[in-house]
Amino acid sequence: MDILSHIALVLVPGLGNASIRKLIGLYPDENLFALSKGDLETVFGRHKGIAECIANRSTFARAEQELTFCEKSHIRPLFFTDAAYPARLNRQETEDCPVLIYCLGDCDLNPERSVAVVGSRRATAQGRDNTCRMVRELAPWAPHIVSGLAYGIDSAAHTTALDHGLPTVAVLGHGLDRIYPTANRPLAKRILDNGGALVTEYTSGTAINPRYFPARNRIIAALSDATLVVEASEKSGSLITAAIAGSYQREVFALPGRVTDPYSKGTNRLIARNRALLVQDVRDIAFQMGWPIEEAPQTDAAKEAEHSLTEAEQQVIALLQEHERMTLDELTSHTGHTLAEMVSILFKIEMLGLVHTLPGHVYQVAHA
């Protein structure tokens, strides 16, 4: 089927994404709109309304309008069988994701690494600062930064990505004929001007509706290898994104906050209920994701931490830099410290993000 038929198929009332995936699997070489009404009724059984809609090509007029809009606006409609369609949306656990998305911008939606950064719309100054710090320190691994173009954490994530040369993808809960919130139009333009993309599953003319935004969140989660929740209250929509990411078997990370802070209750609860891994800096993310930690420069926090190290702690860091990896017994033998003293030293410098523990009580320095 051509792209016009794909758009028309998605517009058929009552025909969901999972059903379309199954249909295309059953008839990979068939144009469903070319099947007879009788054949379609056999396929859809008691859902005769769907069969009749396809047989009568009832959605083609609207599909033609949408395709014309896309062509005039340089928008790419991407069906799930297209090579440019995001492969992360095509996994078994993401079959509820849209089979057709609309993409404005030339950004490759199949990058090597991709991280969603989400959080409260009513972000605190600390929340915005933490977002900027985390995205800035992710730059050495060059992930795409995915978010939702909302106020607060989303805007900070997109802006910081742009400031540090990272492609960023904004997933919208409406059609590409508008930008919401309107105050973020300049940010949307900057995203497009710098190799990013605006993505949605909704056709042009789709009104702004709060119920579309939770559905939008599943695309944010699915486009990403990991989701980082920076700051979230108990009712933040970013918690929906985190829950969906977990259901998609993607990693979920959260920055902890003060227990008395209402804007950290959501993130703290994710951590407390084991629905997110606690992170303090990006090295925690890189280590969990299996990214090459030794290639990244020190984080700001790690640089500050090194100035406060004791002589014994500096000795351990120097040994690990010299030998690359050492066991607990080797470190104890080289330094002359007792086992208890060495465990205490390693615990502190690991908490500072300066070393990482590998299986078998093996330690390596967290930077080159």
Task: State where each predicted segment sits.
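Short, small/acidic-rich helices and loops at N termini and domain boundaries
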Residues: 1-84, 270, 352-354, 359-361, ...
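Glycine-biased, small-residue-rich flexible motifs in mid-sequence functional cores and linkers
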Residues: 2-3, 80-368
